Amino acid sequence: MATPLTLLDALLRGTLLALLLLMAAVLRRDRPRAPAAWAGVAISLGLAVQVLGAMPWIEERLAGSAWFAPVIGISVANAVLFWVFVEALFDDDFALRPHHALAWGTAMALGMMNCLSAGVHATPLRDLTMTLQRAVPVVFAVLAVLAAARHWRAD
């Protein structure tokens, strides 16, 4: 039997998913050529995957399996998408460049690798990759703040 807290969790997650998908659809429809809109679509979809992957019944069934690795990878890489989104919002001359895709792909691969090696006993390499994964959100949050600060006077 579902508890009131479980039902509230499902309600809030469902609402958030609906809003994220609506935002992605509206940005795609209304601003098909704007880099900030594309970055907004990407982060909205990435966050939708993260919300779905964090649902308790999905975590119970998929955690530790290879099927869960892309969800973890996307969740880790969302920090990079946040940085790209901020860059696109504040920099009028923003264009998506290869280093943006490289940063996103690297963060995703790091998250996937750590998910797939979750059952492995602690090794120096695993400790290093887990430390790097924990640093990803902090590093890209700082980069987002720097990007906003660099361009805020122009706006």
What residue spans do the PLM features occupy?
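N-terminal low-complexity or simple alpha-helical regulatory segments
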Residues: 1-155
